[in-house]
Structures are given as structure tokens and as C-alpha cells.
Amino acid sequence: MIFVTLEHILTHISFSIISIVITIHLMTLLIHKIAGLCDSSEKGIISTFFSITGLLITRWIYSGHFPLSNLYESLIFLSWSFSIIHMIPYLRNHKNDLSVITVPSVIFTQGFVTSCLSTEMRQSAILVPALKSQWLIMHVSMMLLSYATLLCGSLLSVALLVITFRKNMDIFCKRKNFLIKSFFFAETEYLNKKRSVFKNTSFLSFRNYYKYQLTQRLDYWTYRIISLGFIFLTMGILSGAVWANEAWGSYWNWDPKETWAFITWTIFAIYSHIRININFQGTNPALVASIGFLIIWICYFGINLLGIGLHSYGSFTLPSN
């Protein structure tokens, strides 16, 4: 009973802290001159990380197994993974460009766990025989870490596509306006317009340079986060194959979950191949990664909710027979 109460407290503490953190982020977007807000935000994420860590440890102690057996536990671990990803640039003293993605991801996951899941779905249950293996920690943790990192990388690629699209639209509109004005206005008026354009050239070039730097940083972090997630996904699939051979006598059964994991792996393998090619950097790999965002949610959430296949017991609370 004490552990259940402690788990309940830690769940709400982590959600409250991350809510405060995202409020601070919104304030920094509106008011840049308030000192200490950014540091408070980073400390809040660290506090959230320790709260979720305590929650997982508490769950592990009173359930008697590593907390990765149902939807509730996997979502808590996913939220924990997002908080780890957030702290990577912070620990390396880099500018944290990931906070725009990781902080909303943590609050969305924690909010869903706190508000949307029923009490029955949060209950710990006895593991089915197939899950009573040391491979549970290795396989499921690697898969969830890969989901978290690949989701962050995919969202960064979506942001890259949006910025690039807006930039191209601005260029198109300027060219269109230029053609219309040069066709309808007199030569003298055109020259006056041209002079005013030259006066604003420094401002426009600065703004374009800022967008260029932003897209470069997004591309940099997208590639590195997805590369890390791809490694986790590969390790998760390989460890799952070994575990499947021990449990079911076959390394691969083309179960719906396995099939979609393979599709996910293929999508991000294509991304890595395109991204390495210098002729296709930029929007082309970002487009592939953004498609991967939907594929991951189908693989993680969609297949489990359908309740089909050998992995269907990983979604909801298991019966304690």
C-alpha cells in the first residue's frame, strides 16, 4: 500500500513539474529578458527525470519485475526516455535545440498516463510465462528508447520541412510580386522600388542567414538523434529475435508487431542512406523521417490497441491467472 501511494505521488509530482516547465518555455518565447528562466526549465526537467526514475524503481520493487509489461508502464518508460534525450545537449554544454520537441513530448505522455488511463490499466499484474525472461529488460527497453529517439528526430525533421517550405513560399511570393510590378509600373517607379530593396538587403540577408543556420542545426540534430534511435531499434529487434527463439522456437514469425518493426527499421535505414549522400541532404531525408513518425506510432500504439498477434499482451493489464 505504501508503494502504491508513493507511485501515485511521484506520478503527479512529475506531471506537475513538467507542466511548470512548459509554462516557463512559453514565457521565454514571449519574454526573452527574464533572467534565470532557462536554467529553471532545465532544472525542472532534471527534477522530472528523477521523479519518473523513482516511480519506475517503486513500481519495480512492489511488482517484482521490471516495469515494462503493459501500456501504462511502457508510457512511463517512454516519458523517462524523452527526459533523457532532453538532457543530452545540456550535459554536453550545447545549446538545447531539442527542448522544443522533448518538453511537449514529456508533458503529452505524462498527461495521457495521468488523465486518460483507467485505474485498472495502471494495476501491476503477474507476468505471462513468455515474459518471464531476462530478455524483457534488454528487448523492451531498447525498443522504447528507439521509439523515443526516433519520434524526436522525426518531429525535428517535420520542423525542418515546415521552415524550408515557408522559406520557399516567401521566395516564390517575392518573385511573383516582382514580375507583376515590373510589368505594370513605369520604369521610374520600378527604379525607386529597386533602391528601397537595396536598402533592406542587409536585413533580408540577415534573416535568410538566420533561417539557414536554424535549418542546419535542425538537420544536424535530426541526423544524430535518428542515428542513435536506429542503433537502439537494431539492438531491440536483434534481442527480440533471440528472445523469440527461446520462447517460441523461431527467430522471426512475421507477427504484426514484428512486421511493423521491420517496416520502421527499413524507413530509417533509407533515411540514413539518403542523408549520407551529399546530393540528397536537406528536405529529401527529412521527408522520409517525417513519414517514419507515423510508422512509429502505428508500430508502438496501433498494433497493441488492435490486440492481435503475439505481442498483444504488451498493451493492457494482464489477467492474473
UniProtKB/Swiss-Prot annotation:
Question: Which parts pass through the membrane?
Answer: 9-29, 44-64, 71-91, 98-118, 143-163, 225-245, 260-280, 288-308
Q: Which Pfam families match?
A: Cytochrom_C_asm (PF01578)
Tell me where the signal peptide lies: none
Q: Which GO terms describe its molecular function?
A: heme binding
- Taxonomic superkingdom: Eukaryota
Q: Establish whether keyword Transmembrane helix is in the entry.
A: yes
Recorded family membership: Belongs to the CcmF/CycK/Ccl1/NrfE/CcsA family.
Function, in words: Required during biogenesis of c-type cytochromes (cytochrome c6 and cytochrome f) at the step of heme attachment.
Q: Which PANTHER family match?
A: CYTOCHROME B_B6 PROTEIN-RELATED, HEME EXPORTER PROTEIN C
Q: What is this protein called?
A: Cytochrome c biogenesis protein CcsA
Recorded source organism is Dioscorea elephantipes
Native organism taxonomy: Eukaryota, Viridiplantae, Streptophyta, Embryophyta, Tracheophyta
Name the encoding gene, please.
ccsA
